[in-house]
Amino acid sequence: MACPLDQAIGLLVAIFHKYSGKEGDKHTLSKKELKELIQKELTIGSKLQDAEIARLMDDLDRNKDQEVNFQEYVAFLGALALIYNEALK
């Protein structure tokens, strides 16, 4: 049986691949795919406006290829984890 942290990491990977590749490259998230992931998988997603998601996409897309790769996605999750940690203090 997998440990809880192993399961959590597996879930983060599975969610990325659930949305990546719906259009184009199966190893990256397009703006549309990222928007769908955020809106369906995060509580805050339904509260974000299109312009906010576009800004987030621009911030996450470090190599400016108009897509979010797995490394950029993990950086996003790390930033979210820091925010969640601060909220628990």
From Swiss-Prot:
Q: Which residues carry this modification: N6-acetyllysine?
A: 40, 47
One Pfam family name from the record?
A: S_100
Q: Which UniProt keywords apply?
A: Acetylation, Calcium, Cell membrane, Cytoplasm, Membrane, Metal-binding, Nucleus, Phosphoprotein, Repeat
Q: At what positions is Phosphoserine found?
A: 46
Tell me the GO molecular function terms: calcium ion binding; calcium-dependent protein binding; monoatomic ion transmembrane transporter activity; protein homodimerization activity; S100 protein binding; tropomyosin binding; zinc ion binding
Q: Which residues form the EF-hand domain?
A: 12-47, 48-83
Localization, per the record, is: Nucleus envelope; Cytoplasm; Cell membrane
Q: Give the function comment from the record.
A: May function as calcium sensor and modulator, contributing to cellular calcium signaling. May function by interacting with other proteins, such as TPR-containing proteins, and indirectly play a role in many physiological processes such as the reorganization of the actin cytoskeleton and in cell motility. Binds 2 calcium ions. Calcium binding is cooperative.
What name does the UniProt record give this protein?
Protein S100-A6
Q: Which organism is it from?
A: Mus musculus (Mouse)
